[in-house]
Amino acid sequence: FDDGNGFVQYTVELPELRLVTIDTLEEGRHGGAFCEQRAAWLDAELAKDGAKPTYIVMHHPPVESGIEWMNTHADEPWVATFTNVVRRHDQVRGLICGHLHRSVTVAWEGRTIAICSSTAPQVSLDLRPIDADHPDDRPMIVAEDPAYALHRWNGRELVSFYDHAGSHTMLAKYDERLQPLVRELKAERPRQ
């Protein structure tokens, strides 16, 4: 998947949807990166089909999450470079990201960013400011069940489901007692 410039970037063409995967890794940096070479590749890739709904898949989200030590700030140069490319392409419906080890949904530039939790330990959901000079014993990484996202294209929108890979206690099952509810719900919908 090398794009010819040493970055792992590629496009998946589906019948009704495009997924453009970009490399936001920079050696020696924890946060994201997006240089002019990557910007040129993304701009050219997006220009190939301006009509088909497209989602950009990337590790680092270009937004502040509220988990301060994991934030990406809007004034970081790579964010401006990336944002300028995306603004030129109206077919980009949203972004699919990771990095935060926490499920987050963000409205960004008129698009939706879906950020998935991790299949490894999670980042603690702590929205307090953090002082780099004064450790305060807050939890930073927590042992929650591994998590994942399932993205489903319904022909109009991308629908994202988030779940944890642990066992779940069943509270209700589809049996004769719930059959009337299911029938009522289906009767409310247009026939297909």
Question: Where do the protein language model's features map onto the residues?
Answer:
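Short glycine/proline- and charge-enriched loop/turn segments
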Residues: 1, 64, 71, 130-133
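Extended active-site neighborhood of metal-dependent phosphoesterases/phosphodiesterases
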Residues: 1-48, 53, 78-91, 109, ...
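Active-site neighborhood of phospho(di)ester-bond hydrolases with catalytic His/Asp-centered motifs
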Residues: 23, 55-58, 91-101, 114-116
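Short acidic, glycine/proline-rich loop/turn micro-motifs
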Residues: 23-25, 66-70, 126-127
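Active-site environment of divalent metal-dependent phosphoester hydrolases
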Residues: 27-30, 61-66, 93-107, 121-122
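Short acidic, glycine-rich surface-loop motifs adjacent to enzyme active sites
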Residues: 49-66
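A contiguous binding-surface segment within folded domains or other stable secondary-structure elements
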Residues: 62, 66-87, 92, 99-102
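Binuclear metal-dependent phosphoesterase catalytic core
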Residues: 85, 107-192
